[in-house]
Amino acid sequence: MTTPTSTGAPVNILVVDDEGNIRKTLAICLEAEGHHVTAVGNFQDAVAEASRRTFHMAFVDLRLGVESGLDLIPVLLSGSPWMKIVVITAYASVDTAVEAMRRGATDYIPKPFTPAQVLLAVRKVEEVRTLEQKVAALREDLERTAPEVRFSSESPGMQRAM
C-alpha cells in the first residue's frame, strides 16, 4: 500500500455529516479552493465512498444520527491508513477530543466553525502529506545508497556490543 502523492494538487476530501447544510457549506468552502469534495450523510455511505475512491482527508461529524463518527475513524483508516481525519462537532468536549485523537483523528474542530478554520485544517494536512513524502523519499535514498551493513565478530566483547 502506497501513500498518495502530494504535488500541490487538489486534495480529495470526504465530508461526512448528517446535516445537509453542513455538508453543503463544507463542499462550497473546499471546492472554492480547488479541492475535490465528496459529501455523504451517514456512516454506510462514507464507508462505501472510501472503498471506491482514494481520499487524502475526511471531515467527520462526531454524531451521525444514531451512529458515531468516532466509530467511523478506525474503519476509514483501516482502508486508507494515510488518510487524515478531522472531527467536527457541535458537542465538543475534552473527552471526545481525546477519544477522537486516540482513534486516529488528526484534528478536531467545534461547530460552529469558520471557513478559515476549515482551510487551516486542510493546509495542515497538505503540510503533513508533503513531509511524509519527503521522509519516504529520504528513506528510499538511504536504503539505495547505504544498504544495511552487518558486522560479525568472534570476540565475546564485540558480540555483546552489537
Describe each PLM feature range:
Residues 23, 65, 89, 93:
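The feature encodes the CheY-like receiver
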Residues 53-59, 64:
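Active-site beta3 strand of CheY-like receiver
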Residues 42, 68-71:
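Acidic catalytic/metal-coordinating carboxylates
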Residues 139-162:
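AAA+ ATPase active-site-proximal loops
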Residues 20-38:
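Two-component/phosphorelay signaling modules centered on CheY-like receiver
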Residues 34-43, 49:
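Short hydrophobic/Thr-rich beta-strand motif most characteristic of the beta2 strand and flanking loop
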Residues 48, 70-82, 99:
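Short amphipathic alpha-helix used as the core "switch/output" element in two-component signaling
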